[in-house]
């Protein structure tokens, strides 16, 4: 018992020393001890005063990519929607399975409004990702990877009475990964890097809707 207490004390002292040496304030240290690391409120929650984590809320995610993007990345619209859906689900947001949405889209090629999807699946919100650009290569290079994309992420809230929807949230999203230097194709396969970037991009989009920790922000520079 005494040995265990001593180990705990030593670990606490080491953590405290690291914080002091790295410039942490005593207030921050105390906050960590009491409630854990500080979290960031989702931008969607701040702007709309609503939350996708509320009880009985269900969300559909759909992505649109123009022909010029799908020429190089054939299924990027479905892939990104799938990754974002999984991120939301992992953060306790109820979602429509992405394969069901893909099936509906395949059967309704002429759809043009997010509310059509919302009405069919009887959800409260539709997250609509309008992908304007997407690449996995460093500019001017064919053997260096760097994911880049530009998109508009909007949320459509379904009317409780009829099938209409209102756009209640919209944000431009510009993404780049890694931030500091590209990755050589000799170090990672194309498939591996693509998965890494889609994971990163989907988390950047997901953080608009779920809480995350400031420590995650610091450690995600790439």
What positions do the PLM features span?
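Bacterial N-terminal signal peptides that target proteins for export
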Residues: 1-12
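Bacterial N-terminal signal peptides
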Residues: 12-22
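A structural "domain/chain start" motif
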Residues: 24-94, 210-222
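Second-shell loop/turn segments in exported
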Residues: 65-75, 102-104, 139-140, 186-195
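Stable alpha-helical elements in mature extracytoplasmic
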Residues: 76, 80, 84, 110-114, ...
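Short beta-strand->alpha-helix linker/helix-N-cap micro-motif
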Residues: 89-108
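Surface-exposed short loop/turn segments
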Residues: 108-166, 180
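Short secondary-structure boundary motifs at beta->alpha junctions and helix caps
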Residues: 157-218
């Amino acid at each position: 018992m005494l040995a265990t207490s001593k180990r705990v004390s030593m670990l606490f002292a080491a953590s405290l020393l690291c914080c002091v040496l790295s410039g942490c304030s005593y207030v921050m240290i105390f906050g960590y001890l009491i409630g854990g690391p500080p979290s960031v409120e989702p931008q969607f929650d701040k702007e709309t005063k609503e939350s996708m984590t509320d009880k009985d809320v269900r969300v559909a995610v759909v992505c649109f990519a123009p022909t010029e993007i799908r020429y190089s990345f054939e299924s990027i619209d479905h892939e990104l929607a799938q990754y974002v859906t999984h991120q939301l689900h992992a953060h306790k947001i109820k979602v429509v399975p992405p394969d069901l949405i893909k099936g509906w889209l395949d059967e309704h090629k002429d759809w043009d409004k997010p509310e059509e999807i919302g009405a069919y699946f009887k959800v409260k919100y539709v997250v609509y990702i309008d992908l304007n650009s997407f690449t996995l290569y460093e500019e001017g290079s064919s053997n260096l990877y760097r994911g880049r994309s530009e998109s508009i992420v909007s949320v459509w809230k379904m009317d409780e009475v009829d099938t209409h929807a209102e756009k209640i949230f919209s944000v431009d999203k510009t993404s780049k990964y890694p931030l500091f230097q590209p990755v050589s194709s000799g170090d990672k396969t194309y498939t591996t890097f693509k998965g890494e970037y889609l994971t990163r991009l989907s988390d950047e989009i997901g953080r608009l809707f779920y809480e995350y920790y400031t420590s995650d922000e610091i450690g995600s520079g790439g």
